[in-house]
Amino acid sequence: MNTKVTLAGVELKNPVMTCSGTFGSGMEYGEMIDLDRLGAVVTKGIANVPWPGNPTPRVTEVYGGMLNAIGLQGPGVDVFMKRDVPFLRQHDTKIIVNVCGKSESDYVDVVERLADADVDMLEINISCPNVKEGGIAFGQDPKC
C-alpha cells in the first residue's frame, strides 16, 4: 500500500512522525523503534547555544496524567549538526528540525547555521511556555 504524503513540498514515505520535544533526535530510542519505518523524525528544540533547561523536578504526576516542564534543554546547533544530523542520516527518514530561541535573532542564527546542514525541513517553535520568560509563549508576545 502506498502511504506517501507530501508536507510543504517534501515527500514523506508515510505520515508517521515523532512530535517535537518528546523524541530527542532519535538516538535515545534507536534500540526500541526502527527509525527507518518513520516518515520523519521531528527533533527536540534546537537553539543557537546549549540550553540547560529547567531545574529539577521537571516532571510531576497529576490526577489523570503527568505534567512536564523540561525547558527546552538541548545541546545547541553546533553539537546537533556534528552529532545528531549524521546519526539521523544513517536512517531512511526525513529530518525535521524544531528551531527554538529567545529572540528573533536567535531563530535567524539557528536557521542560517542549518542552511548547509543535510536536513529536510524546519519547524519554528513559537509556543513553548516552559521557559524562564514568565511562561509566555514567544508567539504571543507582541514585542517579538
Where are these regions (language model features)?
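Flavin-dependent oxidoreductase catalytic cores
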Residues: 1-144
